[in-house]
Amino acid sequence: MAELSYEEELRYNRQIILKAVDFDGQEKLKDSRMLIVGLGGLGCATSQYLAAAGVGHLTLLDFDTVSLSNLQRQVLHTDSRLNMPKVESAKIALQQINPHVEIETINAQLSEEKLAEIIPHFDVILDCTDNVDIRNALDRRCEQAKIPLVSGAAIRLEGQISVFTYEPNTPTYRQLSQLFGQNVLSCVEAGVLAPIVGIVGSIQALEAIKVRLKIGSNLCGRLLLIDGLTMRVREMKLPV
């Protein structure tokens, strides 16, 4: 396992003093490889907290470019990087947040076959997309490789998060999509208030760290539903 430098020990001190993390946990984070699919609002929030927390390797996957309408909620991107690939814009910002993190980018829309090739090389996959087909492809390939998937969604003032570990007798994303159907609106059609993507993305980062360090109780088998308009949070048990 990779050892922490003195500078890293200082940087991550407030995490290391947590009994659930300690030096072993921080070193495990440094050894970790995570794939973030989608560098929009959720991906920006998720990736900055994973980078700041000291996840040693992040691969960013997206095929889109930065547009002006993104800047209201996609906090890693800036006016000076309009029309730049989102993965490259995010990489610049994340390297400024934490230069100790290795960041790779994939500026492409990968086929399901290509996803099947790369997913086994990661410890956790984070689904930060707003595309049902991509979500289902990630679910199938993560299930095949038995790699945990942390899925989040945000629209209007509402958010939802769940974790899929693919252990025996646990649900998959298919069960979730069957509950809500395939005709899911995007924020382009329905709108989204900026802070809700930050809330959901931050929880995704938290769940990814918990899954990787095997601490606490993650959202496997449960769907966390957040209503930002009323500030009510509820939980739904997912069918197996």
Role assignments for model-derived ranges:
Residues 1-240:
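Adenine nucleotide-associated cytosolic modules
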